Amino acid sequence: MKRLFKYTLIALAAILVLPAAFLCGLYLTADMEQPAVTIDTAAYRVTNHGGYTTCHGSFLRRNPHGLWELYTAGPPEESGAAAGALTAGLMHYQEQVFVDQIREFVPSEGYLKFLGGMIRIFNRNLGRHVPEEYRREIYARSLYCSHDFDAIGTPYERQLNYHAAHDIGHAMSQYMLVGCSSFAAWGGASDDGKPVVGRNFDFYMGDDFARNKIVTFCRPQAGYPFASIGWAGMIGVLSGMNSEGLTVTINAAKGPVPLASATPISILAREILQHAATIAEALEIARRRDTFVSESLLVASARDGRAAIIEKTPRRTVLYEGDGEYLICTNHYQSEAFDDDGDNRENIAMTDSPHRFARLEELMAANAPLGVPAAAAMLRDQRGTGGKDIGVGNDCSVNQSIAHHSVIFKPATLQMWVSTSPWQGGAFVCYDLGAILRNPDPAAELYDSAQEIPSDTAYLARDYPRVVAYRQLGARIRRAMKAGRKADGELIETFAQTNPQNFHTWKLLGEYYLSQGDDGRAAQSFGKALEAGIPRRDELLAIERLKSECKP
């Protein structure tokens, strides 16, 4: 019996220790494939010209609308080092905001370190899935990163991992970090017969994360020059257009839970933008790369005179072309190849993606043939299907007041219009990519003020203050719940009146009243949430369950 007890203890110890040792081994042997390049950072001195800064053939400026404009050129390590030197302060700001937001999602320091270790293990082979050219550029930029966050990883490891931020947010969809809407029209569906593309990049990491948007104009050593919209440190592409009139935008979709790292979707989009001029070339590049999340890439081409959607999962790549002269893309797949896909069917049944898709269908029909001003109006639309008032910040809205950026492309003329704060409410600033590439003059304004789309004055006067107040009041109620204390009655009433059409308002109030043991008011609030309409079926079922559990 003693021997059996001894062997049982040994077996239990092995069960506990061996997996830990295995994970420790994976952690210690993680290899991000840092490039073996030597860069003399002293050679990359930043010169301030009073309005813009320059470094080694690259420059950074900020336009009157608050958009940062970065021009880079040359080999990856040179353009990367120059960009790193120019944007060092912005990179620190962006990283601080990112880390602070993650801490808000995951307040436990111990669990945060655990997640950091797991991400390191998960992404242990990430480097081999990123082309060396891009790893060299990322490494060069990382030389100018702060060491304030070295507990997370080395600057190079952190910057490489941040390129999978969209993918990680995609996997954390329950936090609603990602939920984009895009569309394209051409032929008889556009006002001049040529493609027009619009997109909202709804990647939300807090309001501060979108405060310093960067419009990058990149002339790489190899491939096509291009423009893209992102943030400091990001060399991947989220939304962009190249000199051949090819545009790429990315929209998250639902797929199997990733089990190993692969190519971040922003890196794939960068590769397409840099090396493709047609939809066929974009598809060929997409098929060569394995990605570890599911994504839709809306690609429009001036040469082809149309657009198509590359629907990609870790297992397959499908081209969806539709049967008309326009395409709409939210967060689910549309091709027949995914008709029987369980993840996609669940996505359509359970999420708000079909609601935004249906609203865009209505707007496309109402605005045909589509021009640039009408595209901006579509991107700013806050109504539900049938024009229903669903409040502000609703998941069913095309404009949820969370977009990092909104952009409109005219591939045939190489023009793009980029939104300015707040969200889509500010002016859309026009850039002529062809003119900028012909004469990248840092002393001159890069945008074309004559083509500017004015700000949405009605939104700024009426809805923007509501959004800000609504989120601030909601945060105060959540803090009261977390602290186990009663919220001020006036606070509750003001919150309810600020955004009564949005189901989130009544859901939060129901949860608050439950925390106070007031089942009657909780049930009443949950009932109002159900009456307002809830886009996500999983959320609908959860609220129905909460309401049913309230005591009479």
Name the predicted role of every residue range:
Residues 317-322:
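Acidic, Ser/Thr-rich peripheral helices and adjacent loops at domain boundaries
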Residues 240, 244, 275-276, 313:
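Surface-exposed loop/turn and secondary-structure junction residues enriched for glycine/proline
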Residues 19-173, 177-179, 273-296, 301-307, ...:
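C-terminus-biased signal that marks the final domain/tail of proteins
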